[in-house]
């Protein structure tokens, strides 16, 4: 999430459409990790539009600064990078102080490593309006404090987090942040969507297929794969005779493929011989209509068994003859050139 005053630098270039295909999001993720005896905590921040990372900051870099991760953001001018880098450095210092305070409030030893994570951002609907805003923190992998959906109140996870909650309430931080979410966060998101529209507003349809994996004589797994799709939002379901098999479906989380697209699978265990009663249904915004797939059994070989056996006999004879010939040639060659035999050996 960019600093509030950054929008003033960018406002002259905001000539954007009023409607969008689907909803979109802008997210700023941060992680501060203490490392006793090895200097200040390390701070890493990444920023995403939808499922695409486009900015990254690492305090351990040779020159700590906000770095572009997508070509479309490289067009921004020097002031943009100055502001985003300054914002990340300020957050890094704030989180380092917060880590020390939390260590003291939880009465923890300074010998151990601790982690403070944050996530801020906004979701925008197709009409360009705010769907939901976020501001939350976790300490050592557990919820600490978060802004509620009403954007007016906070949820504190424990008595220590309530100290932070009282501070936020005294400073009227929820109101300040709500103003940002409803205004500048959405404006920045619209700008990024426009500048990176060839990447961010694309819809790559999934390539889907069903794989068959026998488990035993009594069971087999049908796994429905969806590969190479963007954005990450997708729905995979299995049906048996038209009835959805929600309870019996194993579904993995959508995961990045490493090339800017995503992959996912859903599996069901079925009795042998009943595979054709099951259909996989794939829904994605890149598809003109949902895909419906069944397992396609590979055709059985049509070569007669007798022909196969005869062929193997002939092949065996050929191989045997070749081996005998090679040995005889090798022996003759050895008799003629004993001095060079070792160099010729494989």
Curated annotation (Swiss-Prot):
Residues 1-21 form the signal peptide. Residues 22-305 are extracellular. GO terms for cellular component: cell surface; early endosome membrane; endoplasmic reticulum; ER to Golgi transport vesicle membrane; external side of plasma membrane; extracellular space; Golgi membrane; lumenal side of endoplasmic reticulum membrane. This is HLA class I histocompatibility antigen, alpha chain F. Residues 204-295 are annotated as: Alpha-3. Residues 206-296 form the Ig-like C1-type domain. Residues 22-111 are annotated as: Alpha-1. GO terms for molecular function: 14-3-3 protein binding; beta-2-microglobulin binding; peptide antigen binding; signaling receptor binding; TAP1 binding; TAP2 binding. Residues 330-346 are cytoplasmic. Residues 296-305 are annotated as: Connecting peptide. InterPro entries: Ig-like_dom, Ig-like_dom_sf, Ig-like_fold, Ig/MHC_CS, Ig_C1-set, MHC_class-I_related, MHC_I-like_Ag-recog, MHC_I-like_Ag-recog_sf. It comes from Homo sapiens. Forms a heterotrimer with B2M and a self-peptide. Binds a diverse number of peptides ranging from 7 to more than 30 amino acids. Peptide-bound HLA-F-B2M interacts with LILRB1 and LILRB2 but not with KIR3DS1 or KIR3DL2; this interaction is direct. The OC form interacts with KIR3DS1, KIR2DS4 and KIR3DL2; this interaction is direct. Interacts with TAP1-TAP2 complex and CALR; this interaction is required for appropriate folding and peptide loading. Interacts with the coat protein complex II and 14-3-3 proteins; these interactions likely control the anterograde ER-to-Golgi transport of HLA-F. It is a single-pass type I membrane protein. Belongs to the MHC class I family. The chain crosses the membrane at residues 306-329.
């Amino acid at each position: 999430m960019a600093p509030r005053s950054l929008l003033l630098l960018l406002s002259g270039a905001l000539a954007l459409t009023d409607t969008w295909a689907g909803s979109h999001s802008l997210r700023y993720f941060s992680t501060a990790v203490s490392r006793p005896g090895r200097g200040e905590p390390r701070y890493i921040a990444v920023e995403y539009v939808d499922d695409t990372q486009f900015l990254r900051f690492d305090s351990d870099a040779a020159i700590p600064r906000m770095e572009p991760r997508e070509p479309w953001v490289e067009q921004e001018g020097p002031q943009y990078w100055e502001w985003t880098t300054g914002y990340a450095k300020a957050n890094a210092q704030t989180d380092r102080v917060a880590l020390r305070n939390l260590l003291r409030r939880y009465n923890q030893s300074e010998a151990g490593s601790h982690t403070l994570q944050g996530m801020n951002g906004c979701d925008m609907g197709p009409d360009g309006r705010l769907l939901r805003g976020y501001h939350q923190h976790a300490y050592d992998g557990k919820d600490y404090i978060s802004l509620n959906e009403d954007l007016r109140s906070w949820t504190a996870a424990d008595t220590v987090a309530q100290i932070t909650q009282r501070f936020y309430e005294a400073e009227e931080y929820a109101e300040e942040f709500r103003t940002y979410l409803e205004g500048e966060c959405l404006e920045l998101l619209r700008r990024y969507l426009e500048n990176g529209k060839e990447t961010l507003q694309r819809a790559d349809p999934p390539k889907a297929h069903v794989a068959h994996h026998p488990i035993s004589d009594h069971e087999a797994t049908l796994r429905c794969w969806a590969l190479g799709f963007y954005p990450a939002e997708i729905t995979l379901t299995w049906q048996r005779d038209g009835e959805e098999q929600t309870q019996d479906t194993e579904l993995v989380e959508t995961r990045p493929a490493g090339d800017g697209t995503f992959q996912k699978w859903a599996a069901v265990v079925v009795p042998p011989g009943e595979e054709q009663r099951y259909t996989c249904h794939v829904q994605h915004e890149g598809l003109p209509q949902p895909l419906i797939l069944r397992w396609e059994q590979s055709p059985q070989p049509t070569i007669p068994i007798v022909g196969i056996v005869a062929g193997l006999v002939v092949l065996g004879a050929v191989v045997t003859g070749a081996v005998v010939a090679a040995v005889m040639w090798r022996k003759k060659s050895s008799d003629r050139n004993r001095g060079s035999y070792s160099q010729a050996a494989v």
